[in-house]
């Protein structure tokens, strides 16, 4: 096995093919047929129009400007009127806006995705009934009306037979999917699922249980100590401003520590990288808490005023010493002790954790142990700490609908901190074992590649084969599309609308809008839904046709008017950069806002929680004042959660109200002695950007990182062809021998290993999902992308 490189000849051929795509139809003007020689002056871009929109090469929604000349996109650059790409705190944004914003490699490469010659251009119908990995579907091109009529007929037959609930719907977690959720409600299926379940629902559960908000954000610019567990924001950039804000924090004097089994790009830029065994982050955090409490370095006044359960937590960590944690984590006790003292005595400080600790079976409890370190030191919602964002956005237009009383297939309600995005692994498992409340019959998959995204690739393929009918809407013939009966050509983010509530610390609403019309005349996903709704005659609870006269522009205009901005779609378009932001900016310590409790309110003498006569929390009494508090059940930060303690996980096990450490379910043994982890980088998103030659030039293969000492013991050298084997899968890979990974761990970048998708993506690297178990965290339902052990040997 050798790693192929994209030659300049191949690159030019792809670019020429892209030009041909852009030339399709009389409306379109071809891209240049040649590549500008290196060093030549860039063609003038003064002509045409600069249209503001938001990127969607990943979920970060960076603000961008697209130069459209004669009907084609000629250039993409950052939009400085949008804070994503520049800052997440308003003062930093307004002070440094003139410096310009940033954009990651994916954003720059978006033009190729728009004009990729491998895009699906017309609806396709399967003519080969056999399904399986690598099986030729023998596609037949059909018209849009034929495709929509057939899909609607299948949906109508299900509904008329009383089986509407057997429809599965998978999609992205963006506002353009709200109308898809409406469709599912009106049609009668509870099985609407979104991408979040495959990404960060455990982190959402972690912080929601401790702080009451599921996505706090770090004010790194103003911090003096930044401690990250299992997060790579300088490369796996969720938001493109993160490298800048973290770097500016370091320039302002912050000490930067990264705890991670792998020396990621972020770890390589930190003052200190602390290699740790996967899934043991919670044990290190508990030992840090032990040191902070025993040394009386915690913020006693903040804890007394704004936390519950401290006494129970303090008693629990009494024996969780650094020496105890060293045996579990592999991190030296002296290092844990030193980091704990540095963190507690350097103010302000940030502690944060993402998918590293979050994609294991002990994710929520381990993550809670990390989150309570912020509460312990008073580093919450203050400048330079972990912030509770005052996020803005659109409001889902109200709809009157009588929802089905059928249960979800995935058992979401049995996950005590499950997320509305569903539980993908449970759907797959229940299709295969038949232990769900019913067997699903049909699936609609929009903008998702389930086969390479859900742990346990072979299980996903077998589950899709068991469905009677599968519809995929995508821009590529992905591995999931390969399993479909109908494939609809999808839209890119440059061809559709969406309202974006930006993930910054103050309310900001921006617009994703078409900068060119759909280049193949295809319907954007929301118009597909509208057309299906019309064909099915879907009505609301009052009997009024919901989709009959609906225009999506009107739908999102109502979203904008009902949300933070309170303006119309046209008014948002007219604002600089098509961005609205609250002029009040970032607000700190929002929990301190004083409130007037209603008449008849009562105060819990134990917690200070103030509730109205109906038992609803309305504030928190601290001293002689009633404050807004946090959005937890008690209104305070929770070291101990009575809510969790009263519940059981999906397996029927009682949940500890404390962030108790328990080992994850799968651990190395003699047969499979190495942890296997994965990660992401800035030049790719999940499994969906691998047909872009600009990005594949940066990295076109995911070699398996293995510690040099471990490799030496196994007789493996850098570049060797190797076998990777787990209890669930076996495949060849190429070794990357390095000092930058824990000796008991191997790992690689997620998303490679396509056998479909497109000419550039096909056959590059190894698909990591095939090695994993199709399971989820029992509390949050998070897919377990890192819960597997392997053996590695020379091929």
Question: What residue ranges belong to the model's regions?
Answer:
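Long, contiguous, secondary-structure-rich segments that constitute the structural scaffold
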Residues: 524-578, 687-705, 709-795
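N-terminal leader/propeptide and maturation segments of large enzyme subunits in energy/redox metabolism
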Residues: 122, 126-146, 297-333, 515-619, ...
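Glycine/threonine-rich phosphate-binding loop and adjacent beta-strand/alpha-helix elements that clamp
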Residues: 217, 494-518, 528-529, 533-538, ...
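Extended redox/cofactor-interaction regions of prokaryotic respiratory oxidoreductases
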Residues: 2, 180-246, 252-259, 266, ...
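Flexible, glycine/charged-enriched surface loops at secondary-structure junctions
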Residues: 162-166, 298-303, 350, 381-388, ...
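Flexible glycine/proline-enriched surface loops and loop-helix/loop-strand junctions
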Residues: 135, 229-231, 269-270, 319-324, ...
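Active-site phosphate/pyrophosphate-binding segments
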Residues: 288, 307-424
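N-terminal export/assembly segments and adjacent metallocofactor-ligating motifs
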Residues: 2-295, 319, 332, 531, ...
